[in-house]
């Protein structure tokens, strides 16, 4: 394994209820394929929700998650700290009002974690 192959990126996908499955899939699949083509895990990811419970996408498919917001706050202080956070949302995003999520996103950003949005995730980032 060379030095380049030891560099790993950890990505958190924060799933908002009614998130766009197609936006999520088109973000995560290239990471999976890159790992396969490289022959090592250059990218790892976890799915997060506010409470750690499954989140239903806009197509009614329910996705299990790996962590809650509380878990992510703890991870920020440890080696599980992500390189990036993507907010995955979709329809009805203007109804999403969660001060804990907004504060957590600011914490991530202030600690040097790249933060971005998928589909209408930019709407949440602008809040």
Show which residues each predicted segment covers.
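Extended, subdomain-level signal for the structured scaffold at the beginning of enzyme domains
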Residues: 1-115, 124-127
């Amino acid at each position: 394994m060379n030095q380049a192959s030891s560099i790993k990126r950890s990505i958190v996908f924060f799933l908002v209820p009614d998130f766009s499955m197609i936006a999520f899939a088109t973000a995560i699949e290239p990471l999976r394929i890159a790992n396969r083509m490289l022959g090592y895990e250059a990218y790892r990811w976890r799915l997060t929700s506010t409470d750690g419970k499954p989140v239903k996408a806009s197509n009614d498919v329910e996705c299990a998650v790996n962590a809650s917001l509380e878990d992510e706050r703890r991870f920020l202080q440890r080696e599980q700290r992500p390189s990036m956070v993507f907010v995955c949302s979709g329809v009805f995003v203007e109804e999403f009002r969660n001060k804990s999520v907004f504060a957590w996103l600011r914490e991530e950003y202030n600690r040097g974690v790249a933060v971005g949005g998928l589909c209408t995730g930019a709407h949440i980032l602008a809040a």
